[in-house]
Amino acid sequence: ESSGKIEVQTYGSSQLGKDKELLQKLKLGQVDFALPSSVMSSVSDEFGVFEMPYIIKDREHMKRVQAELGDTFQAAAQAKGYHIVGYFENGFRHITNNTRPINVPSDLEGVKLRTPKSKWRLKMFKLYGANPTPMAFSEVFTALKTGVMDGQENPYAQIASAKFQEVQKYLSITGHVYTPAYILASKKHFDKHPADVLKVVNSCATSTQAFVYRKAAALETELLDVIKAAGV
């Protein structure tokens, strides 16, 4: 669509840095786009709404929230020097651990639980009695394997891709938080691109969101089977 003007190179698994580093690299122009999720609540409190338990019911609900509050989130991002190009999803988060099944909040009592760096998530799990500790995603597998952490909470996609099922005994399907992922750019650097390039980028972001939602919904059953197959 861009007649060769746009070439996208993707880097996964924190190759270009952890969440906080990538936010800084965006502003410095060292990367063009990042895909942050929970860390956005540390950028502006408006994004903390997605850290509240059981706020988002399903993807259709998320679409309505985005339609109604999208301008609010964009303004919050731009006030900090960022621009939201589009929305993907991180997904509904579930708890895995090696201590016990989590059926009620009190089952979290004393569990050393890895969380993203989100003050709201930390508050939530502290109220539930857990011992939440922020930690970079790339460090979680080793922390679970060595017992530094008892458990963690993530969507199925992250659990399966990081192979947490290999070092965890229990999966509790809690769906306690739904976290979007934001296609994020530096406002200053994004605005420097020609109008025709921006039109293509924005169009692709919008059309890809629909694909991401469809794919995520389809993968939920498939990835849950992968996790269960490991004996969790």
Please provide the spans of the model-predicted regions.
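N-terminal secretory/targeting leader peptides
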Residues: 1-61, 69-73, 77-232
